[in-house]
Structures are given as structure tokens and as C-alpha cells.
């Protein structure tokens, strides 16, 4: 029987976590308006690595400029973010921990006040972040663009030294909105039955896996 203190090997990649204790993604709201990581947020995560966590997971980071949901949320939608992200991963690795980034898009939970854009979702849904109270339904071009944004964001994480990424499919954000029956009422290939509703998530996953190295973890 394995103990929490035992190392864990990711069989498909060969990466080894020094133990089975994982820091979950937790929102800090400490970073800068342009999406770059602040020293305060870096220090918070590194302190947890020093505390012995085998895997450090960042807070949710938006892959598209229009996917931001709250103040102080760091981003990975632009190459300008790579430098600060690399500082984080270097310091975490120095403590012997793996480092994962949690990638997400807020969808109808994005903030029009912060992004300047009306939130988009799988369908027209209520939206506290929208001035009108409702999101727009994502068009085909929006979906393809966001899939590409997730892919580019994952590639930036590779460049920044992350060991992998976690696709945030919970808490009512965009991936979850596509998966849900109540939030996805589309009748095209992106909705309907479970196969259609899961297409968005699977397209993101496949697109990322086609681009990143085999040693990079995607979950």
C-alpha cells in the first residue's frame, strides 16, 4: 500500500513527484492588471513548495484576454507572461516539486468590466459579469479561437518550464458550460448529446497534445 509520502511516477511521461501531496488550485487575486504574476503570488506558491508539496498547482489562469473572471487573476494569454511564469517554475523546481498551471476561460462568468467584452458561453446564459445580465452564444469562429487560445497557453507553459497543465472543467466555467445540459442548449455539433457537449473539451485536449512534448502532462 502506498503512503502519501511515497513518490509518484506519471507512467506516460516518466515525471516523478517526490510525494503524493498536491497543492490544489486556489485563487489568490494578487497579480497585476496585465495578467503578469506578482511577487506576492509567486512567493505564496513557492512557500507551499518549501512546505513539502510534491505538486504545486497554480490558481486558475485565463487563456484568453476575454476569459478573465476576477481582479488580480494572472493570465497566460500573451508571451509577455512567460518571464514571470518561468521565475515561478524555477523556484518551485528548486524545492524539488513539480509545477502545474490550471488553464481556464470564464465563459459567462467572465467580467465585462475587466475585459471590455460581453461574456460568451456555450449558449445564451445568465451572466453576473455582463452588463446586460446575459452572455452571448459562442459562434463557430469563437469556439475555434478559444481552442487555439488554450493550445497557445499550454505551449507558453511549456516555454515557462511547467511540468504540465490542468484543464479546469468545473465550477461553471466555460468548459463546464459546454458540458452541462442546462448551460449548453445548442443543436449543432457542439451541443446535444454527451458526445456533442464534450467535443469542446476533447478538441482542446487533442489540440494541446498534438503540440506539446510527450513529457508534458495534460489533465
Locate each region found by the language model.
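Non-globular sequence segments
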Residues: 98, 104-162
Amino acid at each position: 500500500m502506498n503512503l502519501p509520502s511515497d513518490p509518484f511516477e506519471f507512467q506516460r511521461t516518466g515525471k516523478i513527484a517526490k510525494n503524493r501531496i498536491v497543492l490544489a488550485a486556489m485563487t489568490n487575486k494578487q497579480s497585476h492588471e496585465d495578467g503578469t504574476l506578482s511577487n506576492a503570488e509567486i512567493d505564496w506558491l513557492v512557500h507551499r513548495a518549501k512546505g513539502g508539496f510534491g505538486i504545486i498547482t497554480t490558481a486558475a489562469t485565463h487563456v484568453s484576454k476575454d476569459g478573465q473572471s476576477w481582479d488580480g487573476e494572472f493570465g497566460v494569454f500573451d508571451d509577455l507572461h512567460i518571464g514571470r511564469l518561468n521565475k515561478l517554475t524555477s523556484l518551485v523546481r528548486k524545492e524539488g516539486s513539480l509545477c502545474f498551471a490550471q488553464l481556464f476561460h470564464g465563459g459567462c462568468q467572465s467580467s465585462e468590466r475587466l475585459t471590455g467584452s460581453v461574456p460568451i458561453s456555450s449558449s445564451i446564459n445568465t451572466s453576473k459579469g455582463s452588463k446586460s445580465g446575459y452572455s452571448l452564444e459562442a459562434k463557430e469562429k469563437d469556439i475555434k479561437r478559444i481552442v487555439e487560445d488554450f493550445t497557445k497557453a499550454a505551449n507558453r507553459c511549456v516555454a515557462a518550464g511547467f511540468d504540465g497543465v490542468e484543464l479546469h472543467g468545473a465550477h461553471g466555467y466555460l468548459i463546464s458550460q459546454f458540458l452541462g445540459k442546462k448551460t449548453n442548449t445548442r443543436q449543432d455539433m457542439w451541443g446535444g448529446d454527451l458526445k456533442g457537449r464534450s467535443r469542446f473539451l476533447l478538441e482542446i485536449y487533442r489540440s494541446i497534445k498534438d503540440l506539446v512534448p510527450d513529457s508534458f502532462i495534460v489533465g
